[in-house]
């Protein structure tokens, strides 16, 4: 009788069969004992099976080293997988990925590496994707999921892969290039009537942003000012990810301003916490100049009411007490109130006409007096009317769109 010791190795070999057979019967000097032997049934085939539950002695330890960092758009330096026991040359290391702040869109996953001539190492690299998004540092993990042959059969009975992974951080470039830049354009109305809401402005991105991203808007003014519109400060990226629309309300004021131009432009694309969505923006064409025009036919809301108070009487040769012109809406300080005169029993020879008054620091009042002429004629009571004919600037341009002058006069008796 005899026994045979089997070798407990690490390889997943399946059932393995060997035959042990009698080759002779000899003495201690190797001389045959018998003249002849019938050995037809002097053998046994025995099958060696792997353990059902592999132990530590059946386990291959796998480790991985590799880069902690990579710049977006670059290929990583080498990752190296190392085995504690050799595998056949050409065996396949299968790789798996998990993501924390990164995603599968940020890299091109390398799915396998090949065991080299030494039988214990495999190297590979990973390509990162250079996108346009300002994502900050993004972390992914690459790990070993198995060691297999070309038919996907395991090479080893058991693997310890507790240290067979590397976490790598992808960082945005310090200086984004053209490939990292999103082009932003804007279209919108060239004109709007004062008091109306504009038609739509549309912001368009060359690359999609998350739905709900915020387009921040900025304004500059040439002949218009911030008082002429209600600034829309942001627009929201819609379901298509590349467009946002908005309108702007104009203010219907009383001023005769002529055509007024403002510019609305894109200042950024951000998330709800004001973090940039993209690494870089080209906003050179992300603006629209819009001209605000006064209404052709001003309405009551565009009309300034002007009133005048003053002396009912003056003695010939005296200077009147003050006349006061009052506006319902302010005019710029220094604006000119133009005055007109008409006569009933008096005439232009009876007074020295004051032709204008100046709006004071309060913006709504102007005062003036009128000199009467002391002549030799016994004329009795003479009546003249002074009235407001306009409110203008230093170049005689109207300040307001329309005036209500129904009560902008005083009749004075000399």
Q: What does each model-found stretch correspond to?
A:
Residues 1-414:
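Short boundary segments that mark the start of a structured unit
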């Amino acid at each position: 009788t005899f026994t045979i010791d089997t070798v407990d190795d690490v390889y997943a070999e399946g059932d393995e069969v060997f035959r042990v057979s009698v080759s002779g019967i000899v003495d201690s000097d190797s001389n045959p004992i018998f003249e002849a032997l019938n050995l037809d049934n002097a053998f046994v085939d025995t099958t060696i099976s792997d353990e059902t539950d592999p132990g530590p002695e059946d386990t291959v330890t796998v480790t991985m080293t590799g880069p902690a960092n990579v710049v977006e758009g670059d290929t990583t330096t080498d990752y190296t997988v190392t085995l504690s026991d050799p595998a056949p040359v050409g065996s396949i290391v299968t790789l798996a990925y998990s993501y924390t702040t990164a995603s599968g869109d940020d890299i091109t996953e390398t799915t396998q590496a090949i065991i080299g001539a030494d039988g214990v190492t495999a190297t590979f690299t990973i390509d990162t994707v250079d996108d346009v998004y300002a994502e900050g540092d993004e972390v992914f993990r690459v790990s070993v999921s198995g060691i297999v042959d070309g038919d996907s059969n395991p090479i080893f009975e058991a693997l310890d892969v507790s240290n067979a992974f590397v976490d790598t951080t992808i960082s945005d470039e310090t200086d984004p290039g053209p490939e990292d830049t999103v082009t932003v354009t804007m279209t919108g109305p060239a004109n709007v009537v004062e008091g109306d809401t504009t038609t739509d402005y549309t912001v368009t991105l060359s690359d999609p942003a998350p739905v709900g991203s915020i387009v921040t808007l900025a304004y500059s003014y040439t002949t218009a000012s911030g008082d002429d519109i209600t600034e829309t400060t942001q627009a929201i990226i819609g379901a298509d990810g590349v467009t946002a629309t908005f309108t702007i309300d104009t203010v219907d004021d009383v001023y005769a301003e002529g055509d007024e131009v403002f510019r609305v432009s894109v200042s950024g694309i951000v998330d709800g916490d004001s973090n940039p969505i993209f690494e870089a923006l080209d906003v050179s064409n992300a603006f629209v100049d819009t001209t605000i025009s006064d209404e052709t036919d001003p309405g009551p809301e565009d009309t300034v009411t002007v009133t005048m108070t003053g002396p009912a009487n003056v003695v010939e040769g005296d200077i009147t007490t003050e006349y006061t012109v009052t506006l319902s809406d302010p005019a710029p300080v220094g604006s000119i109130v133009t005055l007109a005169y008409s006569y009933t029993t008096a005439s232009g020879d009876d007074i020295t006409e004051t032709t204008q008054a100046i709006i004071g620091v309060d913006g709504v009042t102007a005062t003036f007096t009128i000199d009467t002429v002391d002549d030799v004629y016994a004329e009795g009571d003479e009546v003249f009317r002074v009235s407001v004919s306009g409110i203008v600037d230093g170049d005689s341009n109207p300040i307001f769109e329309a005036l209500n002058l129904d009560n902008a006069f005083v009749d004075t008796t000399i």
